[in-house]
Amino acid sequence: MSSIRLYNTLTRKKELFEPLEPNKVKMYVCGPTVYNYIHIGNARAAIVFDTIRRYLEFRGYEVKYVSNFTDVDDKLIKAARELGEDVPTIAERFIQAYFEDITALGCKKADVHPRVTENIDTIIEFIQTLIDRGYAYEVDGDVYYRTRKFKEYGKLSHQSIDELKAGARIEVGEKKEDPLDFALWKAAKEGEICWDSPWGKGRPGWHIECSAMARKYLGDTIDIHAGGQDLTFPHHENEIAQSEALTGKPFAKYWLHNGYLNINNEKMSKSLGNFVLVHDIIQQIDPQVLRFFMLSVHYRHPINYSEELLESAKKGLERLKTSYFNLKHRLQSSTNLTDDDDQWLARIQEQHEAFIREMDDDFNTANGIAVLFELSKQANLYLLEKNTSERVIHAFLREFEQLLDVLGITLQEEELLDEEIEALIQKRNEARKNRNFALADQIRDELKAKNIILEDTPQGTRWKRG
């Protein structure tokens, strides 16, 4: 039985995770509208839900992960007009850019990345069924969802229909029955990209695409539906209304939403000029640092993006990597066994269990990272031992590799290779033997500048990364 507990936006409480089918998870994550490069707010969602997927797989679940592309909508049509290009060309360019960005950030591709334009027939069929059942109606080529007919409308965002009605209004030119009704199909305007339908030429509304594609690739009911907090209403609320009206079944068992991202304590917006694109920022900083930073705060909490906090994340990640590479280096001088192996192996197991405990509690990556720092501290203490064993070193290395892989952090080799360091130490030893202390000091300083610390012992010169 699962020990994972997750916070469900639908019920506003933590619940024991019990997928519909044992050991299998069907997960749908709302993807980007591909009219531009993704910004760091999009990146947070991509990183968070990639990590949750990785953790579920680490715990033995088989995850089918679907994340869509909105490759036709008002923003794309506007961009096409401004750039003098067609919508498919712009969409394709930014889909490829999206893959480049998320790959740099350590995110795995989804099992399926459906596009709206490749699923028009599925969407039309879905809309027609809603019309047949009285949940939708057509007016002059537009099709609207009859919101009041769905009695549970507002259950995800915890708003009553009357509260919503008070803030709703009908725009000029709209022919809706009710201000709360929303578009499922939009009649084509002159010069716009469009498709044939039973209601004339047009294109899908935003909300219907996710309902149709989630059902096509994952079935009537899915385990986890996820996205940014800003999508809770109206997007996810409308998805529930559409899908449950069609199937008569719950659309998703668990709803997960990541918190907002602020820039220097201000909301990110183009008008404030603080809009940060992933494409730009990863030219300036290591993408792994950006990922580590995003995971340093619980996914449901707001996160504040600043240079100071990024620098702190960079130093934290360097601490973990330094411990890891110092362990790798010590393997060369370790023995088969030492007397206190079992004691150290027990400490490593404690950290393994602590990591699982924290991540089982609503995927708390912030506390999971704290466990990794404790593992690093234990590793550093072990490296102070006069004699170290291969068995313990390997156990530490495996633990670092396994837990960092859950967080999507790769352990790449340092720029200065062990062989290069050993060659410089050999050169320094010869210089000392020949009483060329100036050269010996120069080599020590050169290594120190590369964060390599030397320790001269009766058994020879040892080194470690600082």
Curated annotation (Swiss-Prot):
Q: What is its main location?
A: cytoplasm
Q: Would the keyword Cell inner membrane be found if you checked this record's keyword annotation?
A: no
Annotated residues that bind Zn(2+) are located at 30, 210, 235, 239
Compartments (UniProt record): Cytoplasm
Pfam families in UniProt: CysS_C, DALR_2, tRNA-synt_1e
Record-level GO cellular component terms: cytosol
| Chain positions found as Phosphoserine | 271
Q: Which reaction does it catalyse?
A: tRNA(Cys) + L-cysteine + ATP = L-cysteinyl-tRNA(Cys) + AMP + diphosphate
Q: Could you provide one GO biological process annotation from this protein's UniProt record?
A: cysteinyl-tRNA aminoacylation
| Enzyme Commission numbers on file | 6.1.1.16
Recite the UniProt keywords alphabetically.
Aminoacyl-tRNA synthetase, ATP-binding, Cytoplasm, Ligase, Metal-binding, Nucleotide-binding, Phosphoprotein, Protein biosynthesis, Zinc
Q: Which cofactor does it need?
A: Zn(2+)
- Ranges spanned by the short sequence motif 'KMSKS' region, renumbered to the chain: 267-271
Note the CDD domains from the entry: CysRS_core
Q: What class of enzyme is it?
A: ligase
For this protein, the record's HAMAP family field holds: Cys_tRNA_synth
| Identification of the protein by name | Cysteine--tRNA ligase
> Encoded by which gene?
cysS
